[in-house]
Amino acid sequence: MVGKGLPVLKNALKQLEGLSKAASVGTAEVIQKAYHQLTKLQAARLVFAYVTLVLLYVIMMLILTSSVIDLVGFSTPHRLPPFVDQAQLKHFNTAQDTLMIVFVALGVNFLLVILVFLIYLLIKLKHIEAPLSGSMSYFAHPVLKYIFGIMSFIFVFIITVFSILRITCADANTLVQDLELLSNTSFADTNFTNAAHAAVSGLLTNCTAPHTDIAKCGYSGVHLLMSLESRTRRLWTGSTSGGLTEAGIPRMLTAVGSCWMTKEVVPVILLVMFILYMFLHLWMVIRALRRRRLGTIIEDEHLPLTSYEDGELDEEGGADNLLYAIPPGSTIPGMRKWNYTPARA
């Protein structure tokens, strides 16, 4: 008997293979079957499937956001100053509102799917690893399993928020240029907020709705005010209808600054989270592969457990005449069926 957890592990494997509690099994067989049951069959495949799902989702969201923004931008090239085509600008606003709804719905649904899969993974791993010691489990410590789950879901959540913000903040750099031209101040200047507030306030006085008079508004003013009329950009100003108002200028300036900051900070956060997430998973994979090189691991994963009932072993015949096969059709979960007949002397 090796370790306090070995009896529990033996009983668990007996239940998996349909053996009676009184059946005796060898320690080497227990280690072999527990190893294959955990790392090669169920636990490793579940974790790999979850990691694959997360990475596919991340790749999909990054490609989709970049693609749709580029496609909408290419279809409306003349919406930007200094030659603002108002029809194209309205088309861009409509497309942005539609994409915003689509990505919010897509992101929320995928978050729920990944969360359900993560909960299933943690419950399944807890069930599989319950009888095993830390040295034999896929995760070295139970806490590491939850750290892995929390980190992965935070990573997915950040990707989702970042994808939605990329749609919301599309054209934000052009709006910053509009504000710089209107205020004659650099965005990096400490006085930019005050100067931009005064410039936009004066613009609203001279450039009345529908903000299409190039002579009074200028190309930058037309682009700025018409861009803020979209439903997506109304979230920036708190306006329920129409476009920018005097009361919404501070919120608009804050939103533009936040979008600019998002484009600088979020990619760094994503990169750090991705590196940590992949290093953690890589460490677990290497740990599993190193265990496969142990001399106690038998390569034939399809050998069923052999057993004999306590008290029935005699010295003359040994255990060979009492060996029996696993009932036909029964397998360890995840292992292919076999037809095993013990060799007779």
UniProtKB/Swiss-Prot annotation:
Topology in the lipid bilayer: Multi-pass membrane protein
Intrachain S-S bonds: none
GO cellular component, one term: membrane
Main localization (coarse): membrane
Localisation per UniProt entry: Membrane
Keyword Transmembrane helix: yes
Protein name (database record): Putative membrane protein ORF59
Keyword Transmembrane: yes
Keywords: Membrane, Transmembrane, Transmembrane helix
Transmembrane stretches, start-end: 46-63, 101-118, 147-165, 265-286
